[in-house]
Amino acid sequence: RQKEVKMILYIIRHGETQWNVEGRLQGQSDTQLDEKGIRLAKVTAEALKEVPFAFGITSPLSRAKVTAQIILGDRNVPLYEDERIQELSFGSWEGLGCRKENYQIPSEHFDYFYTDPLNFQPAEDGETIQQLCERTKEFYQELIHKEEYQDKTILIASHGCATRALLRNVYTDTSDFWHGSVPLNCAVNIVEVRDGKSRLLEEDKVYYGKEDCVNFYGADK
């Protein structure tokens, strides 16, 4: 009997950064993992140490790339960069506070980013959610139809908003963009792909305790 061929994708959000803690918009600004971010990535790496990754693909931004490097550890496998899975660009709003207590964004409707993301109006030099969905879809569809990847297990290191955009290729209800919230730092979504059909095996799984959770909206949400 022929072995069933399946591709397994581990789609992970990067570890914590100082801007995550401060509630500032990161977008495509190249922030670094903080100490806790490195620790969370190591905890996640330990949990995934038996996973037979053939290779990794990462956003070129350091916070995703270092997370991927930590998770791949001493596996001697390639790590490729792909700009299509970097975070949504917030343009001139990057670095600004986006929580109630530190709000600096020059728009009264930034809350659409959470409440109605597909109608979110970005800064003039920023990106819409639709644009993000288009580039991540192109990446995802190209990946899952590559003949030579059909039996591979692949690590994909990305970002909060970009991860949700990637998963629109998997979710049955694409009108619900956030599926609850921005994924936590180092949250892992595991997707199985057979014959170009995707199925979510694990959603937003974290391998660390509740005391380490920092939600995008602040620690108490």
Where are these regions (language model features)?
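General small-molecule cofactor/ligand-binding pocket signal
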Residues: Y10, Y80-D82, L201
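Active-site signature of alpha/beta-hydrolase-fold catalytic machinery across serine-
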Residues: I70, A165-N169
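Short, hydrophobic/glycine-enriched beta-strand segments
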Residues: I8-H14, I156
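Acidic, low-complexity terminal tails and accessory targeting/binding regions
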Residues: K6, L88-N102, H145, Y149-K152, ...
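Short glycine/proline- and acidic residue-enriched helix-loop micro-motifs
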Residues: H109-Q131
